[in-house]
Amino acid sequence: MIAATPMPLLKQPDRLEARLRELPAEPGVYFMRDASDRILYIGKSKKLRSRVRSYFRDLERLNPRINLMVRQVCEIEIIVTDTEAEALALEANLIKQHQPHFNVLLKDDKKYPYLCITWSDDYPRIFITRKRRLGNSRDRYYGPYVDTRLLRHTLFLVKRLFPLRQRPQPLFKDRTCLNYDIGRCPGVCQSLIRPDDYRKTLQKVAMIFQGRSSELVELLEAQMLQAAENLEFEKAAKIRDQIRGLEGLGAEQKVQLPDDRISRDAIALAMDEQHACIQLFQIRAGKLVGRLGFVADAQSGSAAAIAQRVLEEHYASVDSVEIPQEVLVQHDLPEAELLEVWLSERRGRKVEILSPQRQIKADLIAMVERNAEYELARTQQSAERHTASLIDLADLLDLPELPRRIEGYDISHIQGSDAVASQVVFIDGLPAKQHYRRYKIRNPEVRAGHSDDFASLAEVLHRRFRKFAEAKARGESLAPSEQRQGSLLRPDDLADFPDLVMIDGGKGQLSAVVEVLRNLNLLEDVKLCSLAKKREEIFLPGASDPLPTDAEQPGVQLLRRLRDEAHRFAVSFHRQKRTERMRRSRLDDIPGLGHKRQKELLAHFRSIDYLRLATPEQIAEVPGIGAVLAQQIWGYFHPSETA
């Protein structure tokens, strides 16, 4: 018997009221779950009953994002704690573990890079990335940094002060490269340094990005004196050069405070109706050592609430040694005392949160706020350009509304071999890579020597829109108005219905897609166009001639960016599949013949050609190959003689 799908609590008033009455008036953490038992949101409260009830009391006063979340809640779970500070610590850990969608305040903004140290590797790498992956919890990310140039320059100098791994992969299999010869790498590729010793070097480097350069200088000075006492003068000279380099690196910082004994962070933000741009300055030993930048949804709360949440997310992701003695804030935080207690417990020493009104600290906050306003202005200008592109495209294609979600499709193959397709998604004019999809073409007629782009596109569009056709047949709305905003939030339901679909190709490719959508009874629902490469011509369904366009108009340029991205994504997937096929041995197709036995066979016979000429008895002489498997191998190369 199939279990019934749970209904949202808002549609079950009696059950909702009973569940709310069960909640204790004690501190703790609460979980909001949907019909699929996924965690939508994790929160904390001093009084669980009051906080959870507040979500369901008046939905209209909630911001649109939380309103959407509450309408999906089917179950509420709690964990009771002794204190509110314990609840805050538990909430931070649970959010980090589960990453609930509606807890993600900060947008995935690629313009601010991170510095990553892969502690999960035996010999960790250090590199700059614009994507904060969560693949291994042991890897450490610092940032996001506002000044990309300064970050690259700092890493450049660090790699010359300390002997570090310079390459993702070794250049040679059996010898070191030039970096080892000139002293920039300790010979990681040939294991010329023990992993523990290499990690000690990298731990010193990490101190620089933790804002602990002064502490590192003191450590190196002690090591230099010890080396000199031991008559290790060459080692002492190297450490001396490292100290001088670190002092020179610190001298480049422009902002200084007279009090160099206290570590402090200063946070401020600027916001409009849509965007909140947050800047966090890290002051250590009286100098500005780091500028971090964040972008959040302005509708997620007040300026003070957003600042509080940013600080909670930021400090939950850093090591305890990176938490400063003081945190200067632009606005009084709604739960400043609670945050102070939590940070003090994590740091092991007292942390103060201050909202300065005058003198040097107030001037520092004002400077951070000016930088936040500058980033907001840049964000607004970028958003205006993208909006202008969407308006122009809607006018060009005569769309009923702005195409906030656009999907682009392309096919990639070489004469039918390794045929694949790509689906890329632009939301509000920008790539939304979390929604990208890749397809392997399953059509048996599409194979090496037999290509068919029309059939491939037809297959992919059928697979993509089949769920919408089934929903329409059941009488469901493809994009409910109350979920329209959710199309950006929930890619796994019917709310991801596109406003526009673009096909990379001309009239032929577009006609193949039109036929598929007609068969699915979706032709009237899906807005379609195609963009041909040769003359950058735009075609619409049923039109024999391309639209008259100007190649420089914003809407056309947006389609070209979408087309180029779909092409890039398809080609990269095709190359991946082709490389995998080329790396596969012909012996992979023989059942029971694993990688180890394949190596034994090739080592014995030197090549597959010689193996093909061998008798079953000769094959059976190879270690690990019995008579039965030898007969199977011989039969694979001589199918006509075994038939």
Curated annotation (Swiss-Prot):
<dbReference type="InterPro" id="IPR001162">
    <property type="entry name" value="UvrC_RNase_H_dom"/>
</dbReference>
<keyword id="KW-0228">DNA excision</keyword>
<keyword id="KW-0267">Excision nuclease</keyword>
<keyword id="KW-0234">DNA repair</keyword>
<dbReference type="InterPro" id="IPR041663">
    <property type="entry name" value="DisA/LigA_HHH"/>
</dbReference>
<keyword id="KW-0963">Cytoplasm</keyword>
<dbReference type="InterPro" id="IPR010994">
    <property type="entry name" value="RuvA_2-like"/>
</dbReference>
<dbReference type="GO" id="GO:0009432">
    <property type="term" value="P:SOS response"/>
</dbReference>
<dbReference type="GO" id="GO:0009380">
    <property type="term" value="C:excinuclease repair complex"/>
</dbReference>
<keyword id="KW-0227">DNA damage</keyword>
<protein>
    <recommendedName>
        <fullName>UvrABC system protein C</fullName>
    </recommendedName>
</protein>
<dbReference type="InterPro" id="IPR047296">
    <property type="entry name" value="GIY-YIG_UvrC_Cho"/>
</dbReference>
<dbReference type="GO" id="GO:0005737">
    <property type="term" value="C:cytoplasm"/>
</dbReference>
<dbReference type="InterPro" id="IPR000305">
    <property type="entry name" value="GIY-YIG_endonuc"/>
</dbReference>
<keyword id="KW-0742">SOS response</keyword>
<dbReference type="Pfam" id="PF08459">
    <property type="entry name" value="UvrC_RNaseH_dom"/>
</dbReference>
<dbReference type="Pfam" id="PF02151">
    <property type="entry name" value="UVR"/>
</dbReference>
<dbReference type="GO" id="GO:0009381">
    <property type="term" value="F:excinuclease ABC activity"/>
</dbReference>
<comment type="similarity">
    <text>Belongs to the UvrC family.</text>
</comment>
<dbReference type="Pfam" id="PF12826">
    <property type="entry name" value="HHH_2"/>
</dbReference>
<feature type="domain" description="UVR">
    <location>
        <begin position="214"/>
        <end position="249"/>
    </location>
</feature>
<dbReference type="InterPro" id="IPR050066">
    <property type="entry name" value="UvrABC_protein_C"/>
</dbReference>
<comment type="subunit">
    <text>Interacts with UvrB in an incision complex.</text>
</comment>
<dbReference type="GO" id="GO:0003677">
    <property type="term" value="F:DNA binding"/>
</dbReference>
<dbReference type="Pfam" id="PF01541">
    <property type="entry name" value="GIY-YIG"/>
</dbReference>
<dbReference type="Pfam" id="PF22920">
    <property type="entry name" value="UvrC_RNaseH"/>
</dbReference>
<dbReference type="InterPro" id="IPR038476">
    <property type="entry name" value="UvrC_RNase_H_dom_sf"/>
</dbReference>
<dbReference type="InterPro" id="IPR035901">
    <property type="entry name" value="GIY-YIG_endonuc_sf"/>
</dbReference>
<comment type="function">
    <text>The UvrABC repair system catalyzes the recognition and processing of DNA lesions. UvrC both incises the 5' and 3' sides of the lesion. The N-terminal half is responsible for the 3' incision and the C-terminal half is responsible for the 5' incision.</text>
</comment>
<feature type="domain" description="GIY-YIG">
    <location>
        <begin position="25"/>
        <end position="104"/>
    </location>
</feature>
<dbReference type="GO" id="GO:0006289">
    <property type="term" value="P:nucleotide-excision repair"/>
</dbReference>
<dbReference type="InterPro" id="IPR036876">
    <property type="entry name" value="UVR_dom_sf"/>
</dbReference>
<dbReference type="InterPro" id="IPR004791">
    <property type="entry name" value="UvrC"/>
</dbReference>
<dbReference type="InterPro" id="IPR001943">
    <property type="entry name" value="UVR_dom"/>
</dbReference>
